[in-house]
Amino acid sequence: MNKKILASLLALPLVVPAMAQAQDNAVKISGFGTAALTWSDDDRAQFGRPNQASGAADNFRTGVDSNLGLQADYAVNNWLSLTAQGLVRQDAEEHYGAELSWAFAKFRISDDLSVRVGRVGLPVFMISDYRNVGYANTMLRPPSEVYSQVPFNSVDGADITWRRDYGNTTITSQLAAGAIKSPLDGFHVRGKDIVALNVVAENGPFTLRVGHARTRITVDDLASLNTLVGSLRAAGAGYRLPQLTDLAGQIEAKDAKGTFNSIGLTADWNNFVLQTEFAKRKTETYINDTTSWYVMGGYRIGKFLPYYTRSELKIDGSINSTVPAACPAGYPAACTPTLMQLDGAVRRIPVSGVGQGEQTTDTIGVRWDFASSVALKVQVDRIKPSGNGLFINAQPGFSGPVTVGAVALDFVF
């Protein structure tokens, strides 16, 4: 990401007031942020959000849940507007980093139809457009079991949105297409030929969403993966074991197909609050096929909103090791030990890496809207991973369960 561009974006509040007055307040500046402390009760692994390189262990960390965002909107005329959004948060480089979340031109074709061109949010979740805006959400953070399953937050391309009322129900359909490169812990994931369809039905306090996304995934700078793929191919050729070469092709992530299907429901009726999502991920590479879901329920008591969430991530399918247990008689002495090492590495794939693994989480929390545009949240998660689950930097012997606590102050301006 070009730091100079983002620095200019984040400096907009210093330079646009005069411009806004001169142009009849055409430029609008808004922002959001979260100041948080996060900790856990286990020092053998770290808890972090998706795309973070480090997280909280048995110490207090500000970077896991804290962020600051700024958005600038400029209305050129009644059919064209420009939007840019910058976000500062702890990222895959193990420190606070700046990113350009959105940067698009919006063309209003009619009252029902609009087109955006540039960097737009990728509509794959119930709260895709405001997942980083803590104040807009009941929970302190989106459940990682679901929201870790797609590494892309935005797409460089375009989307088209069509909205129509049918009696008391409003239907919104959104189709996005493009490509993006997303940094993760020590490597990048590239998605090309991304196509995402998002359909939302709203009726009173209820919102139903259905989505489908597909892409071609490439991971070409992950050292451990490249070493394994190269070793399998070398062993396959050197020991005349073609199944190893075939296995290397199955593991390698190079223009591999991937799909993500999801459905979600929200309700805010009287004092009851409900939010739930169910998702299925499938890929033709080393990345696991998964099922993930969560259900959150809460009840509003004055300015307080206590809530409970149950979330789960399960592996449906993963790479199966076809490495032989031993080499045939007469092969070099080093052959069987080599196969044993390769087999162990292949078997570790389903439970290691970003967005891999299985886990369940029980969450209790409370939101307190004690002032205008400001909310205080306290949340405790009890996480039961299978293996490492979604924890990062796990040490030998880590197993869980782990308790994670956080206090956050969300605000918008």
Where are these regions (language model features)?
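Positively charged n-region of N-terminal signal peptides that target proteins for export
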Residues: 1-4
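Outer-membrane beta-barrel biogenesis signature
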Residues: 6, 10-15, 19-61, 218-221, ...
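Residues embedded in well-ordered secondary-structure elements
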Residues: 11, 20, 59-61, 73, ...
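Short, flexible helix-coil linker/hinge segments at the edges of structured domains or between repeats
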Residues: 130-142, 224-237
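Outer membrane beta-barrel
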Residues: 25-40, 59-183, 191-215, 299-316
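Outer-membrane beta-barrel pore domains
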Residues: 42-44, 56-57, 104-108, 214, ...
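Transmembrane beta-barrel outer-membrane domains
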Residues: 24, 61-65, 95-100, 151-153, ...
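Short, glycine/charged-enriched secondary-structure capping and boundary segments
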Residues: 10, 45-48, 130-133, 391-393
